[in-house]
Amino acid sequence: MDLARPLETLTASERLEKSLTAAAADIKDYAIPFEQLLDFTREKYQPISLKKPEADWPLTLSKQLAILRLYLERGQILPAATLMREWIVSALCWQFGLPVQISENREKAEATINALTTPNPSWEPPCKEEFLELDCAPQIQNLWSQLREVRNTL
């Protein structure tokens, strides 16, 4: 759960769920007190479980928000802030129609949001027009600025 790589967290949760299912019969027969723990663990990690995150980006982004909620519930502010920044970049790539996992696309999305939250940037953001067309552009800019402050504080 402490991974800063959200796609790996999703697939690790998928593997955990399979392991829990495989162990369920033995636990039920031989370790009855642990059955509740098994159910609790499954309940916590099932919402963030995804076998192939790259296959469905809207679902992947939704699952990453579930990971973010878990971080916040546990008071893990730094991983939450890190994930939220990565999530915004991924969501922007997807919104711009750019393949999310290609690093050049992620750099374009991040450069755009950085430039648009920096007073008088010295460069023209690569996806400025696409970003400004988003209804939620002002909210994203505000959130990005706040996340920058959180990251710098931590």
Write out the residue ranges for each language-model feature.
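Exposed alpha-helical structural elements
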Residues: R15, P33-Q36, F40, K63, ...
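Amphipathic alpha-helical interface elements
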Residues: D56-N114
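Residue-level detector of alpha-helix boundaries and kinks
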Residues: P53, L72, D135-C136
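Hydrophobic alpha-helical segments
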Residues: S90, W94, P119, L147-L154
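Short, charged amphipathic alpha-helical segments flanked by flexible coils
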Residues: F96-I140
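Long, charge-rich alpha-helical interaction segments
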Residues: M1-A55
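Histidine-centered, metal-coordinating catalytic motifs and their short helical/loop contexts
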Residues: L134-L154
